[in-house]
Amino acid sequence: MCRLGADVTGIDASEKNISIAKLHAKKNKLNINYICTSPEKMKSKKKFDVILNMEIIEHVEDVNFFLESCSSLLKKDGIMFVATLNKTLKSYVFAIVGAEYIMRWLPIGTHEWEKFIKPEDLINISNKKKLKLKKLDGMKFNLLTDKWKLSPDKSINYIAQFVKY
C-alpha cells in the first residue's frame, strides 16, 4: 500500500515484531510509521481509511473489544479486512497439528483452537460494531507454488471485508 502512495501506519503489540517490520521497511525504502501498541490501547484522533487485521484476531483475548476498538479507529465508509482461521475440525488438523507439530512452520502453541472464529460469529460481532460484511472468501495455500489464492472453501482460512457504516 505504501508503494501505491498510501500513508501507512503499522501497529503490533510486540516490540520484536515492530523492530523486524522497521528493518524490512528500511531495506525496501518504505516510509511506514510503526507503533508498538494494539487497537485496544491505541489512542488516536486520526481515523483510518483501511484497516488490515491479517492473521491476528485468532490471537486476541477479547474479540468483541478488539473489533470495537478497530471500528472506532476506522473512518465512516472505511474498509476493514480480517483474515483468520475458521473454527472447524479441519482447521485444527491443518493449522495446529499440521503447521505446528508436523511441518514445524510455526512454534508449537502459536494457535489456540478455542480462539478460532467461525465466519458467521465474526459477522455477527462485527455488525454490532457498525461493520457490515461486504465480501467473504476462503483462502487456500498451494504447497507447490508457495502462494495463497482465494477459494470458495472457507473451512480452514478465510478473509472477510467489512465496511463501516
Model-derived features with residue positions:
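Conserved SAM-binding loop
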Residues: 1-91, 119-122, 160-164
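Residue-level recognition of beta-strand->loop/alpha-helix junctions
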Residues: 12, 137-138
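A short, acidic/glycine-rich surface segment
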Residues: 19, 143-148
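Short low-complexity, flexible loop/linker segments enriched in glycine and/or proline
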Residues: 24-30, 97-98, 148-152
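Acceptor-substrate binding/catalytic loop of class I
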Residues: 84, 101-121
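Short, flexible, mixed-charge acidic loops at enzyme active sites
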Residues: 91-101
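Short alpha-helix
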Residues: 113-136
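Core SAM-dependent methyltransferase catalytic element
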Residues: 146-165
